[in-house]
Amino acid sequence: MIGAPARSGGGLRQFYENPDVPLSSGADRARRQARMLADTLKDVTGPACVVDVGCGDGEAAAIALATSPGHRLVGIDWSADALCRAKARGLTLIRAAVDGVSLPLRTGTADVVIMSEIIEHLVDTDSALDEALRVLKPGGSLLLSTPNLAAWYNRGLLAIGMQPVFSEVSLRGVFGRPGSVVAGHLRLFTSRSLTGLLSARGFGSIELSGARYHDVPRLLRPADRMFCAWPGAASIILVRARKT
């Protein structure tokens, strides 16, 4: 979940090394990542190499590995605190920056690269996607998820002059929008901008779907589930793309 700011200032580095910064993948994200991975691995012959970029505390990776046994899963993250927690889950772990630098993996070694709610934390999204494409085998899959700037409730918030949910103007507090947790989001995407970026970086066969957001107020959850059918308005954008 924590994506190492390789070329950013001390403020971001300190933020991601702060043990109070949330590292947990969360049950919803972990389950949907496991489902996407299991569905993708059905087409892979033999043991697969799965790389989880920004693995955080390893919860999502561990659930995915249990759902799809027999495969090798490598977790990469910058936060030493996150990797310390992930180590107890029995994963293969690498501490490395993932923002603006090369991943410490050989070209064409991964069957699947997971970027689960990490891209919104990065300064250099182009380089991160270039690296994901590089380490994938031909025909390999990228599984990516990210909050949706154009989520159905964000459209309403913008209309009344409020900051959209998921967006942040400070690393020290939340201002002008609902919520209180600073997550370190630097980039936000709509389904259209994300599709365009992935295509520009060389990915093909781009498929989008939507997912709900766990922190939506209870009374609004039925609407949030309904909007999952429209990725452009869903809370979370899920992407499956291939290296062609």
Task: Name these PLM-found stretches.
Residues 28-46:
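Conserved alpha-helix/loop element of class I SAM-dependent methyltransferases that forms part
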Residues 58-101:
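Class I SAM-dependent methyltransferase SAM/SAH-binding core
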Residues 115-116:
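A short beta-strand submotif of the Rossmann-like class I SAM-dependent methyltransferase core
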Residues 49, 72, 109-111, 141:
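Structural signature of beta-strand start/N-cap positions in the alpha/beta core
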Residues 3-32, 59, 78-81, 85, ...:
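S-adenosyl-L-methionine-dependent methyltransferase catalytic module, highlighting the catalytic core
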Residues 101-112:
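A short acidic, Gly/Pro-enriched loop at the edge of an enzyme's catalytic core
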Residues 47-56:
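Conserved class I S-adenosyl-L-methionine
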